[in-house]
């Protein structure tokens, strides 16, 4: 199973939630191999796994960015010369074991670390995705880059977690397209509500402002390539208050978010998992 943490807004506690979820899952499932893929160029999740502020997490992360980058940026760099066909690579060359840097992390967790260079690669990746080649769906070939990476691993991991950047850039689309399930954290504010509404539109093409956008949407392109969209697994109300329960000041916003979700569940039940 492949889970992606994402929302179209920063500051929702997504990376903290990802870290806590992944580490707890690995502790409770010692017999399973867990892979973390950090698709956020800020690489905050990777830094946490590699030691955080007090454990030289930043220095450990920077040590991965040598000539042979052991990161998602290193993998993307090796895909740029071969964007539309899967090259002969060893996926394990890009993966590290964070336990070697941070003994507090379970040794059944591996990570494809985040990399700031991904931001620099974005224009090249987007250009390749929009290249016109006879007989080749260049967009889906590029969107499949992480899916290709996972296939190369050939079932080595029972569960995979992806941490995504809040933007809906090409690398975020690459991440989301590879997931089975989405976990969307929200906070008790109107911007989180708008971000959730944006997520429904960006990923699933729901409530587009105009039909003009529909044929070019992420959902339409994936469906055209006979690819399944991930389903929404959880919408996590994160950081509501430092006290027990929900802060009454934010109750109206939370009720609005609940109503938005209920409306979409009623009109598009197929985009939700409804299961553990």
Where are these regions (language model features)?
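P-loop NTP-binding core
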Residues: 1-276
